[in-house]
Amino acid sequence: MIKTNGFRVLAMVMTTLWMVTIIPVTVVQAADFRGQGFDLSSYNGTVNWEQVAEADMDFVMIRTGEGRAPDVDTQFAANYDGAVSAGLKVGVYHVCCVRTPKEAVEEAEYCLEILDGRDLDYPVAYDMERKGTFAGGRENTTVIAKAFCDTIADAGYVPMIYSSASFLNENFDWKKLKNCKVWVASYSDTRPKLPVSADLWQYTKKGSLEGANTDKGYCDLVYSYMEATSIKFTKPTLTMKKNTTAQATVKMGPNGCTDRKSFTSSNPKVVAVNKKTGKLTAKKAGKATIMVTTGSGRKAKMKVVVK
C-alpha cells in the first residue's frame, strides 16, 4: 500500500508475547474495535503463515494489484491461499492509478479478473491516495470512486474506499457514495473524525507482525469496526396479506457496527426476500421463516405468516 505521512503512535504493547507488536489507541477507542487485522502486498515478501496463524489476528486485506492489466501483485495468489489456510477472514484492495470514471471501471474489471471468483469475507477496497486521482476536483474524484465501487458491487462483492483522513474529509461527496464502506489511514492515538463512519482504521504503518513484516521490519495494522456481536429482528413475528410487501428490519450490536447482512427465506414460494435489503414479498398463504446472517456469523430468525 502506498505510504502516507503520519506520526508514530507512542503507546505500545506486546500481544501474544513476541508474535505481534500492536500500537493501540486510547483505552476508550481500543475497547470499541471488533477485529484486529493487517494488510499485505508484495512489499511484505513471502509470508510465513505458520507464524502469522499464531498471532491474535482476525482478518487481512490483501493487495490484488495496481491500475489496469498487467500489474497484478506477484504475491496475491500465495497470500490469499495462505490467509485462508491460517483461518483468517480475507478482503482485498486495488490501487487506483486513473483520473476518469471510464478508467476506474477498467481497473475494477481488472481487479475482478484477478479475484477470479474467490470468496471474500471483507470488502474490495479502492486504494485512492495518489495525487493525480484528485487532480480533477471533488466531483471527478467522487465519480471515479463510484464507478469502481458500482462495478465491484454488481459483481457481488462489497465495495470500499481507502484513503487518508484528510483526503476522505475533503475530496469525496459522500451523499453519492452511500453504498461504499470506508477504510481510513490515520496514524494517531485517536480515531479520526470523518463525514461518515469508518469501517476499517489503519492506525499504524509501523506495527510488527512476525512472519509478515516488510524488509524494514514493519507491517500495517488495522482495526475493524464492521463485525457484529449480535443481531435481532425488530419484529420477531409478522403477518402479511398475499401480494403485499414489507421491510424486514434488524438491529445489530454493538451500536455503530457496519457488518454486512444476508437474508434468506425457508419457503420463498410463500415469502420471497431480497438477499441484500431484506424486502419481503408475500406470494401465497402459508408460513415461512426469514433468516438473517451477519458477516461475522451471527444469526436471527423471524416467523412470517401470509393470509
For each predicted feature, which ranges?
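Bacterial N-terminal signal peptides that target proteins for export
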Residues: I2-M14
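Aromatic-lined carbohydrate-recognition surfaces of secreted/lumenal glycan-active proteins
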Residues: G156-N169
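Bacterial N-terminal signal peptides
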Residues: M12-I22
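Sec-dependent signal peptide cleavage junction
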Residues: V20-F33
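Extracytoplasmic soluble-region selector
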Residues: E227-K307
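Glycine-rich, charge-decorated loop segments at or immediately adjacent to ligand/cofactor-binding or catalytic sites
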Residues: E103-E106, F167-L177
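Substrate-binding cleft of extracellular glycoside hydrolase catalytic domains
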Residues: D32-C149, A153-Y157
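Functionally critical loop-and-helix segments that line ligand-binding/catalytic clefts
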Residues: A31-E50, E54, K175-E227
